[in-house]
Protein backbone atom coordinates (compact mmCIF):
# COMPACT_ATOMS: atom_id res chain seq x y z
CA UNK A 1 0.00 0.00 0.00
CA UNK A 2 1.01 3.64 -0.31
CA UNK A 3 2.28 5.08 2.96
CA UNK A 4 -0.73 7.27 3.60
CA UNK A 5 -3.12 4.33 3.32
CA UNK A 6 -1.72 2.22 6.11
CA UNK A 7 -3.13 2.06 9.58
CA UNK A 8 -1.20 3.85 12.29
CA UNK A 9 -1.57 0.88 14.59
CA UNK A 10 0.11 -1.49 12.19
CA UNK A 11 2.89 1.00 11.53
CA UNK A 12 3.62 1.38 15.19
CA UNK A 13 3.81 -2.34 15.89
CA UNK A 14 6.34 -3.03 13.18
CA UNK A 15 8.10 0.28 13.74
CA UNK A 16 9.21 -0.63 17.24
CA UNK A 17 10.74 -3.84 15.96
CA UNK A 18 12.30 -2.14 12.96
CA UNK A 19 14.15 0.43 15.04
CA UNK A 20 15.86 -2.42 16.85
CA UNK A 21 16.67 -4.55 13.84
CA UNK A 22 17.51 -1.86 11.30
CA UNK A 23 20.86 -1.11 12.87
CA UNK A 24 22.02 -4.65 12.19
CA UNK A 25 22.27 -3.69 8.50
CA UNK A 26 24.96 -4.38 6.00
CA UNK A 27 27.83 -4.20 8.43
CA UNK A 28 27.24 -7.54 10.13
CA UNK A 29 29.51 -10.11 8.48
CA UNK A 30 28.13 -10.12 4.90
CA UNK A 31 30.37 -13.08 4.01
CA UNK A 32 30.74 -16.06 6.35
CA UNK A 33 33.94 -18.03 6.88
CA UNK A 34 32.51 -20.84 4.74
CA UNK A 35 32.16 -18.47 1.77
CA UNK A 36 28.42 -18.09 1.96
CA UNK A 37 26.98 -14.62 1.36
CA UNK A 38 24.39 -13.18 3.73
CA UNK A 39 22.10 -10.38 2.55
CA UNK A 40 19.81 -8.44 4.84
CA UNK A 41 16.44 -7.59 3.30
CA UNK A 42 14.39 -4.96 5.10
CA UNK A 43 10.76 -5.49 4.14
CA UNK A 44 7.98 -3.02 4.86
CA UNK A 45 5.21 -5.56 4.34
CA UNK A 46 2.78 -5.15 7.22
CA UNK A 47 -0.51 -6.86 6.40
CA UNK A 48 -0.54 -10.48 7.54
CA UNK A 49 -1.06 -11.87 4.04
CA UNK A 50 1.73 -9.70 2.66
CA UNK A 51 4.19 -10.56 5.43
CA UNK A 52 3.47 -14.27 5.01
CA UNK A 53 3.90 -14.13 1.23
CA UNK A 54 7.20 -12.24 1.51
CA UNK A 55 8.62 -14.54 4.19
CA UNK A 56 7.60 -17.61 2.18
CA UNK A 57 9.46 -16.29 -0.86
CA UNK A 58 12.57 -15.58 1.22
CA UNK A 59 12.44 -19.15 2.55
CA UNK A 60 12.04 -20.52 -0.98
CA UNK A 61 15.05 -18.51 -2.17
CA UNK A 62 17.18 -19.74 0.72
CA UNK A 63 16.22 -23.35 0.02
CA UNK A 64 17.25 -22.97 -3.63
CA UNK A 65 20.37 -20.85 -2.99
CA UNK A 66 22.13 -22.02 0.18
CA UNK A 67 25.27 -20.12 -0.87
CA UNK A 68 23.40 -16.75 -0.82
CA UNK A 69 21.30 -16.51 2.31
CA UNK A 70 18.74 -13.72 2.68
CA UNK A 71 17.78 -12.60 6.18
CA UNK A 72 14.31 -11.08 6.50
CA UNK A 73 14.28 -7.89 8.59
CA UNK A 74 10.91 -6.37 9.48
CA UNK A 75 10.76 -2.65 8.78
CA UNK A 76 8.02 -0.06 9.17
CA UNK A 77 6.43 2.46 6.84
CA UNK A 78 6.20 4.84 9.76
CA UNK A 79 9.13 7.28 9.57
CA UNK A 80 10.92 5.03 7.09
CA UNK A 81 12.71 8.00 5.51
CA UNK A 82 14.37 9.03 8.77
CA UNK A 83 15.18 5.43 9.68
CA UNK A 84 16.89 4.81 6.36
CA UNK A 85 18.74 8.12 6.42
CA UNK A 86 20.17 7.29 9.84
CA UNK A 87 21.24 3.82 8.75
CA UNK A 88 22.76 5.04 5.47
CA UNK A 89 24.77 7.78 7.15
CA UNK A 90 25.90 5.36 9.83
CA UNK A 91 27.06 2.78 7.29
CA UNK A 92 24.62 0.22 8.67
CA UNK A 93 21.91 0.08 6.02
CA UNK A 94 20.27 -3.18 4.98
CA UNK A 95 21.55 -4.61 1.70
CA UNK A 96 18.10 -4.67 0.09
CA UNK A 97 15.77 -1.77 0.80
CA UNK A 98 11.98 -1.80 0.47
CA UNK A 99 10.54 1.71 0.08
CA UNK A 100 8.33 3.82 -2.19
CA UNK A 101 9.46 5.68 -5.29
CA UNK A 102 8.56 9.12 -3.94
CA UNK A 103 11.02 8.59 -1.09
CA UNK A 104 14.04 7.67 -3.22
CA UNK A 105 15.19 10.96 -4.75
CA UNK A 106 17.28 12.22 -1.83
CA UNK A 107 18.80 8.77 -1.26
CA UNK A 108 19.64 8.37 -4.96
CA UNK A 109 21.17 11.82 -5.35
CA UNK A 110 22.89 11.41 -1.99
CA UNK A 111 24.79 8.34 -3.18
CA UNK A 112 23.14 5.91 -0.77
CA UNK A 113 21.53 3.65 -3.38
CA UNK A 114 23.23 1.60 -6.08
CA UNK A 115 22.61 2.40 -9.74
CA UNK A 116 21.02 -0.80 -11.06
CA UNK A 117 21.19 0.11 -14.76
CA UNK A 118 23.84 -2.48 -15.66
CA UNK A 119 22.77 -5.06 -13.08
CA UNK A 120 19.10 -5.69 -13.86
CA UNK A 121 18.22 -8.64 -16.13
CA UNK A 122 16.51 -7.90 -19.43
CA UNK A 123 13.56 -10.08 -18.42
CA UNK A 124 12.75 -7.69 -15.61
CA UNK A 125 13.42 -4.42 -17.43
CA UNK A 126 11.25 -5.43 -20.40
CA UNK A 127 8.38 -6.76 -18.28
CA UNK A 128 7.86 -3.54 -16.31
CA UNK A 129 6.57 -0.59 -18.42
CA UNK A 130 8.79 2.40 -19.13
CA UNK A 131 6.51 4.75 -17.18
CA UNK A 132 7.08 2.71 -14.05
CA UNK A 133 10.84 2.81 -14.57
CA UNK A 134 10.61 6.60 -14.79
CA UNK A 135 9.52 6.63 -11.16
CA UNK A 136 12.87 5.20 -10.04
CA UNK A 137 15.12 7.00 -12.54
CA UNK A 138 17.09 9.93 -11.18
CA UNK A 139 19.55 11.61 -13.49
CA UNK A 140 21.05 8.86 -15.61
CA UNK A 141 20.63 6.09 -13.05
CA UNK A 142 17.99 3.56 -12.03
CA UNK A 143 17.86 3.26 -8.26
CA UNK A 144 15.13 0.75 -7.59
CA UNK A 145 12.69 -1.73 -9.06
CA UNK A 146 9.03 -0.61 -8.96
CA UNK A 147 6.92 -3.68 -8.27
CA UNK A 148 3.57 -2.85 -6.62
CA UNK A 149 1.27 0.13 -7.11
CA UNK A 150 -2.27 1.17 -6.31
CA UNK A 151 -4.66 3.62 -7.93
CA UNK A 152 -7.02 5.68 -5.84
CA UNK A 153 -10.58 4.46 -6.41
CA UNK A 154 -14.06 5.20 -5.11
CA UNK A 155 -15.34 2.62 -2.65
CA UNK A 156 -19.12 2.92 -2.88
CA UNK A 157 -22.23 1.72 -1.08
CA UNK A 158 -23.68 -0.30 -3.97
CA UNK A 159 -27.25 -0.33 -2.67
CA UNK A 160 -27.36 3.40 -2.10
CA UNK A 161 -26.04 4.16 -5.57
CA UNK A 162 -28.51 1.80 -7.20
CA UNK A 163 -31.46 3.24 -5.28
CA UNK A 164 -30.47 6.79 -6.21
CA UNK A 165 -30.65 6.07 -9.92
CA UNK A 166 -27.34 7.80 -10.71
CA UNK A 167 -25.24 6.57 -13.59
CA UNK A 168 -22.68 4.04 -12.41
CA UNK A 169 -19.24 4.87 -13.86
CA UNK A 170 -16.90 2.33 -15.40
CA UNK A 171 -13.26 2.62 -16.53
CA UNK A 172 -14.61 2.94 -20.09
CA UNK A 173 -17.12 5.64 -19.11
CA UNK A 174 -16.00 7.34 -15.88
CA UNK A 175 -17.60 10.35 -14.27
CA UNK A 176 -16.16 13.75 -15.09
CA UNK A 177 -15.22 15.87 -12.08
CA UNK A 178 -18.30 18.02 -12.71
CA UNK A 179 -20.55 14.95 -12.89
CA UNK A 180 -18.97 13.53 -9.75
CA UNK A 181 -19.78 16.75 -7.93
CA UNK A 182 -23.39 16.62 -9.12
CA UNK A 183 -23.75 12.95 -8.13
CA UNK A 184 -22.51 13.63 -4.60
CA UNK A 185 -25.15 16.37 -4.31
CA UNK A 186 -27.88 13.92 -5.32
CA UNK A 187 -26.65 11.39 -2.76
CA UNK A 188 -26.66 13.88 0.10
CA UNK A 189 -29.33 14.97 2.57
CA UNK A 190 -30.93 14.02 5.88
CA UNK A 191 -27.58 13.94 7.65
CA UNK A 192 -25.95 11.80 5.00
CA UNK A 193 -23.18 12.74 2.58
CA UNK A 194 -22.40 11.74 -0.97
CA UNK A 195 -18.69 11.47 -0.23
CA UNK A 196 -16.20 11.51 2.61
CA UNK A 197 -12.69 12.71 1.78
CA UNK A 198 -10.10 11.33 4.25
CA UNK A 199 -7.41 13.98 3.87
CA UNK A 200 -5.24 13.65 6.94
CA UNK A 201 -2.36 13.58 4.46
CA UNK A 202 -3.79 15.72 1.65
CA UNK A 203 -0.78 16.24 -0.60
CA UNK A 204 -0.43 12.93 -2.42
CA UNK A 205 -4.20 12.58 -2.93
CA UNK A 206 -4.51 16.08 -4.36
CA UNK A 207 -1.44 15.95 -6.59
CA UNK A 208 -1.98 12.43 -7.90
CA UNK A 209 -5.67 12.88 -8.73
CA UNK A 210 -4.90 16.23 -10.36
CA UNK A 211 -3.14 14.45 -13.23
CA UNK A 212 -6.60 13.46 -14.45
CA UNK A 213 -7.45 17.15 -14.82
CA UNK A 214 -4.22 18.01 -16.59
CA UNK A 215 -2.45 19.25 -13.48
CA UNK A 216 1.33 19.06 -13.16
CA UNK A 217 2.33 21.55 -10.44
CA UNK A 218 6.06 20.76 -10.74
CA UNK A 219 7.74 22.07 -13.90
CA UNK A 220 11.33 21.28 -14.86
CA UNK A 221 13.14 23.91 -16.89
CA UNK A 222 15.87 23.53 -19.52
CA UNK A 223 18.43 24.01 -16.76
CA UNK A 224 17.04 20.98 -14.94
CA UNK A 225 15.68 23.01 -12.05
CA UNK A 226 12.12 22.49 -10.81
CA UNK A 227 9.63 25.24 -10.02
CA UNK A 228 6.08 25.08 -8.67
CA UNK A 229 3.30 26.60 -10.81
CA UNK A 230 -0.30 26.19 -9.68
CA UNK A 231 -2.18 26.35 -12.99
CA UNK A 232 -5.73 25.72 -14.21
CA UNK A 233 -5.41 21.94 -14.24
CA UNK A 234 -4.05 21.97 -10.70
CA UNK A 235 -7.14 23.83 -9.44
CA UNK A 236 -9.80 21.31 -10.49
CA UNK A 237 -9.44 18.68 -7.76
CA UNK A 238 -8.89 20.96 -4.74
CA UNK A 239 -11.65 23.30 -5.91
CA UNK A 240 -14.07 20.38 -6.35
CA UNK A 241 -13.34 19.08 -2.86
CA UNK A 242 -13.65 22.54 -1.32
CA UNK A 243 -16.99 23.17 -3.03
CA UNK A 244 -18.32 19.77 -1.99
CA UNK A 245 -17.48 20.57 1.62
CA UNK A 246 -18.38 24.26 1.83
CA UNK A 247 -20.92 25.08 -0.89
CA UNK A 248 -22.73 21.83 -1.64
CA UNK A 249 -22.55 20.21 1.80
CA UNK A 250 -22.16 16.94 -0.09
CA UNK A 251 -18.83 16.02 1.55
CA UNK A 252 -18.40 15.51 5.26
CA UNK A 253 -16.27 18.27 6.83
CA UNK A 254 -15.35 16.05 9.78
CA UNK A 255 -13.33 13.53 7.76
CA UNK A 256 -10.90 16.07 6.29
CA UNK A 257 -8.46 15.38 9.11
CA UNK A 258 -9.07 11.63 9.11
CA UNK A 259 -7.18 8.69 7.73
CA UNK A 260 -8.85 6.29 5.33
CA UNK A 261 -9.61 3.66 7.96
CA UNK A 262 -11.45 6.24 10.05
CA UNK A 263 -14.09 6.67 7.34
CA UNK A 264 -15.05 3.01 7.02
CA UNK A 265 -17.51 2.88 9.96
CA UNK A 266 -19.41 5.81 8.42
CA UNK A 267 -19.47 4.08 5.04
CA UNK A 268 -20.80 0.87 6.59
CA UNK A 269 -23.43 2.81 8.56
CA UNK A 270 -24.75 4.61 5.48
CA UNK A 271 -23.47 8.04 6.48
CA UNK A 272 -21.26 8.28 3.38
CA UNK A 273 -22.17 6.92 -0.05
CA UNK A 274 -18.58 6.89 -1.30
CA UNK A 275 -15.04 7.21 0.00
CA UNK A 276 -11.97 7.79 -2.22
CA UNK A 277 -9.36 5.31 -1.01
CA UNK A 278 -6.27 3.47 -2.13
CA UNK A 279 -7.03 0.21 -3.94
CA UNK A 280 -5.58 -1.86 -1.10
CA UNK A 281 -8.23 -0.68 1.36
CA UNK A 282 -10.44 -3.39 -0.10
CA UNK A 283 -8.82 -5.84 2.27
CA UNK A 284 -9.97 -3.89 5.31
CA UNK A 285 -13.46 -3.66 3.86
CA UNK A 286 -13.62 -7.43 3.32
CA UNK A 287 -12.49 -7.96 6.90
CA UNK A 288 -14.58 -5.27 8.60
CA UNK A 289 -17.79 -4.77 6.62
CA UNK A 290 -20.94 -5.91 8.43
CA UNK A 291 -22.77 -8.91 7.05
CA UNK A 292 -24.97 -7.91 4.14
CA UNK A 293 -23.12 -4.70 3.29
CA UNK A 294 -22.77 -4.51 -0.49
CA UNK A 295 -19.97 -2.42 -1.90
CA UNK A 296 -18.33 -1.83 -5.24
CA UNK A 297 -15.17 -0.31 -6.66
CA UNK A 298 -15.55 2.62 -9.06
CA UNK A 299 -12.86 4.50 -11.01
CA UNK A 300 -11.91 7.96 -9.81
CA UNK A 301 -13.33 10.83 -11.90
CA UNK A 302 -11.65 11.77 -15.18
CA UNK A 303 -10.85 15.16 -16.67
CA UNK A 304 -8.72 16.67 -19.40
CA UNK A 305 -6.08 14.05 -18.67
CA UNK A 306 -8.54 11.17 -18.85
CA UNK A 307 -8.11 8.54 -16.14
CA UNK A 308 -4.46 9.47 -15.62
CA UNK A 309 -3.44 9.24 -12.01
CA UNK A 310 -0.17 9.62 -10.19
CA UNK A 311 1.20 6.73 -8.16
CA UNK A 312 4.32 6.10 -6.13
CA UNK A 313 5.06 2.40 -6.60
CA UNK A 314 6.59 0.31 -3.87
CA UNK A 315 10.23 -0.26 -4.73
CA UNK A 316 13.14 -2.57 -4.02
CA UNK A 317 16.62 -1.04 -4.06
CA UNK A 318 20.17 -2.11 -3.26
CA UNK A 319 22.33 -0.09 -0.89
CA UNK A 320 25.43 1.44 -2.47
CA UNK A 321 27.52 0.09 0.42
CA UNK A 322 26.32 -3.47 -0.15
CA UNK A 323 29.38 -5.57 -1.12
CA UNK A 324 27.31 -8.16 -2.99
CA UNK A 325 25.20 -6.17 -5.44
CA UNK A 326 24.96 -8.89 -8.11
CA UNK A 327 23.71 -11.39 -5.57
CA UNK A 328 21.21 -8.86 -4.24
CA UNK A 329 19.86 -8.22 -7.74
CA UNK A 330 19.62 -11.97 -8.35
CA UNK A 331 17.36 -12.18 -5.31
CA UNK A 332 15.25 -9.30 -6.62
CA UNK A 333 14.90 -11.08 -9.96
CA UNK A 334 13.66 -14.18 -8.13
CA UNK A 335 11.31 -12.23 -5.87
CA UNK A 336 9.78 -10.47 -8.87
CA UNK A 337 9.25 -13.43 -11.18
CA UNK A 338 5.71 -13.05 -12.58
CA UNK A 339 4.22 -15.80 -10.42
CA UNK A 340 5.89 -14.36 -7.33
CA UNK A 341 4.85 -10.81 -8.17
CA UNK A 342 1.25 -12.05 -8.31
CA UNK A 343 1.63 -13.54 -4.83
CA UNK A 344 2.97 -10.24 -3.48
CA UNK A 345 0.18 -8.29 -5.18
CA UNK A 346 -2.53 -10.54 -3.78
CA UNK A 347 -0.95 -10.35 -0.33
CA UNK A 348 -0.93 -6.55 -0.36
CA UNK A 349 -4.19 -6.17 -2.34
CA UNK A 350 -2.36 -4.02 -4.88
CA UNK A 351 -1.50 -4.14 -8.58
CA UNK A 352 1.80 -5.54 -9.86
CA UNK A 353 3.78 -3.39 -12.26
CA UNK A 354 4.89 -6.34 -14.39
CA UNK A 355 2.85 -6.97 -17.53
CA UNK A 356 2.88 -10.76 -17.16
CA UNK A 357 1.77 -10.64 -13.55
CA UNK A 358 -0.95 -8.11 -14.32
CA UNK A 359 -2.41 -10.49 -16.90
CA UNK A 360 -2.88 -13.26 -14.33
CA UNK A 361 -6.55 -14.35 -14.07
CA UNK A 362 -6.41 -14.01 -10.29
CA UNK A 363 -6.08 -10.25 -10.75
CA UNK A 364 -8.77 -9.98 -13.43
CA UNK A 365 -11.77 -11.24 -11.48
CA UNK A 366 -14.71 -8.90 -10.84
CA UNK A 367 -14.74 -10.07 -7.21
CA UNK A 368 -13.66 -7.33 -4.79
CA UNK A 369 -13.14 -4.93 -7.71
CA UNK A 370 -9.92 -6.50 -8.99
CA UNK A 371 -11.00 -6.09 -12.62
CA UNK A 372 -11.68 -2.38 -12.15
CA UNK A 373 -8.21 -1.90 -10.71
CA UNK A 374 -6.42 -3.75 -13.48
CA UNK A 375 -8.36 -1.70 -16.05
CA UNK A 376 -6.85 1.43 -14.53
CA UNK A 377 -3.27 0.14 -14.59
CA UNK A 378 -2.49 1.51 -18.06
CA UNK A 379 -3.44 5.02 -16.92
CA UNK A 380 -1.11 5.17 -13.91
CA UNK A 381 1.76 7.64 -14.10
CA UNK A 382 4.70 8.51 -11.83
CA UNK A 383 3.55 10.86 -9.09
CA UNK A 384 4.25 14.51 -10.02
CA UNK A 385 6.88 15.00 -7.33
CA UNK A 386 8.71 11.77 -8.10
CA UNK A 387 12.14 13.21 -8.95
CA UNK A 388 11.90 16.53 -7.10
CA UNK A 389 14.68 17.05 -4.58
CA UNK A 390 13.38 18.57 -1.38
CA UNK A 391 9.88 17.21 -1.90
CA UNK A 392 9.59 15.76 1.65
CA UNK A 393 10.31 19.18 3.19
CA UNK A 394 8.05 20.96 0.68
CA UNK A 395 5.25 18.53 1.49
CA UNK A 396 5.62 18.74 5.28
CA UNK A 397 6.33 22.44 5.71
CA UNK A 398 4.41 24.05 2.85
CA UNK A 399 1.88 21.90 1.01
CA UNK A 400 0.30 19.94 3.87
CA UNK A 401 -0.59 22.94 6.08
CA UNK A 402 -1.65 25.01 3.05
CA UNK A 403 -4.01 22.35 1.72
CA UNK A 404 -5.39 21.59 5.17
CA UNK A 405 -6.23 25.25 5.68
CA UNK A 406 -7.74 25.52 2.21
CA UNK A 407 -9.97 22.47 2.62
CA UNK A 408 -11.12 23.68 6.04
CA UNK A 409 -12.09 27.04 4.55
CA UNK A 410 -9.48 29.06 6.45
CA UNK A 411 -7.87 30.33 3.24
CA UNK A 412 -9.01 30.76 -0.36
CA UNK A 413 -7.66 29.49 -3.66
CA UNK A 414 -5.51 32.59 -4.18
CA UNK A 415 -3.73 32.18 -0.87
CA UNK A 416 -3.29 28.46 -1.56
CA UNK A 417 -1.61 29.29 -4.87
CA UNK A 418 0.64 31.86 -3.20
CA UNK A 419 1.83 29.45 -0.55
CA UNK A 420 2.43 26.54 -2.88
CA UNK A 421 4.31 28.70 -5.38
CA UNK A 422 6.11 31.38 -3.35
CA UNK A 423 6.86 29.47 -0.17
CA UNK A 424 7.26 26.20 -2.03
CA UNK A 425 9.81 27.51 -4.51
CA UNK A 426 11.90 28.94 -1.68
CA UNK A 427 12.14 25.45 -0.19
CA UNK A 428 12.99 23.76 -3.49
CA UNK A 429 15.60 26.39 -4.34
CA UNK A 430 17.74 25.32 -1.39
CA UNK A 431 18.03 21.83 -2.87
CA UNK A 432 18.90 23.04 -6.37
CA UNK A 433 21.80 25.41 -5.78
Question: Over which residues does each language-model region extend?
Answer:
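Extracytoplasmic/periplasmic substrate-recognition and gating elements
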Residues: 63, 164, 243, 247-251, ...
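Hinge/lid segment of periplasmic solute-binding proteins
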Residues: 101-153, 209, 294-298, 365-367
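Short, solvent-exposed loop/beta-turn-alpha elements that line the ligand-binding surface or hinge
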Residues: 114-128, 170-173, 195, 215-236, ...
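Long, aromatic- and glycine/proline-rich binding clefts that accommodate carbohydrate-like moieties
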Residues: 346-397, 405, 429-433
Amino acid sequence: MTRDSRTTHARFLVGVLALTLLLAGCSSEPTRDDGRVTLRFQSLAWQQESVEATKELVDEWNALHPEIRVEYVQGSWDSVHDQLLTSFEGGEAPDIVHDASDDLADFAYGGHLADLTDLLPERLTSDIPALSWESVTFGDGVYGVPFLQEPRVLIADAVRLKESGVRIPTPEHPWSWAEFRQVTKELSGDGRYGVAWPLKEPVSATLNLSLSAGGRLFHRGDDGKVTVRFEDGDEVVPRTISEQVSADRSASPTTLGSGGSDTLPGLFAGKYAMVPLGFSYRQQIVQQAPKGFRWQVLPAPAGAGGLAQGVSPQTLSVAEDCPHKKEAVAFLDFLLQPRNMVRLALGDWMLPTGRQALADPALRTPEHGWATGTALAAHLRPAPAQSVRGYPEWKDKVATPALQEYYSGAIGLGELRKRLEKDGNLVLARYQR
